Amino acid sequence: MTKSIVIVISGVTAGGKTTLINELHKEFIDSKVISFDDYSIDAFPSAPPIETPVQEAVNQYDLRPLMKDFLSAKDRFSFIFIDFPFGYKHTMLESYITKTVYVKTPLDIVFARQIVRDYYNKSTEEITNWAKIYLDSARQIFTDHEYFVSEDADLIIDGTLPLAEQLKFVKKALQLKN
């Protein structure tokens, strides 16, 4: 039986988590990717309101669907890469994690990436509304998230580095070999 190495990649939305995880998955053939976004956990009725401070909100998210898939994959793959915004902070997942990586990307880049990714076919009014929300509340949520989640990450990488450099840095720092 294989004992899985469980690597969580964390960061704010549009920070580069998914891109890095997909590249790790290509590099490590005997791996599985589990992504928080695939479960719409933040849309469950039990999810805390967005304005709830991340320190209070993190363990209010119901991870049972994600955990079910994780536990069925655990020890069947050499590596499990989890695209998960909260690093070690959720008690349901924490004890299974081998290492966490926090992708720290400047918030102006995050904002621009999110507009390009999520608003490319939206109206000017919708883009302007998102910009107002970002300035009024989302930016502070992202700042709080970054501080709280990155404080106990095993590795913090610069999200502005080219992907190949990020991959090389993660592999070297975490001593990952395929």
Kindly label every feature range from the protein language model:
Residues T13:
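The conserved Walker
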Residues K32-S35, I41-F84:
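Conserved nucleotide-sensing/catalytic segment adjacent to the nucleotide-binding pocket
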Residues K17:
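Conserved lysine of the Walker
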Residues T2-I7, F77:
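Pre-Walker A (Motif I) flank of P-loop NTPase domains
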Residues K89, T124-V170:
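Small-molecule kinase domains that catalyze NTP-dependent phosphoryl transfer to phosphate-bearing small molecules
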Residues Y96-R117:
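Conserved phosphate-donor/acceptor-positioning beta-strand/loop module used by diverse small-molecule
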Residues L20-I21, H25:
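Post-Walker A alpha-helix
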Residues S10:
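Residues at the beta-strand->loop junction immediately N-terminal to the Walker
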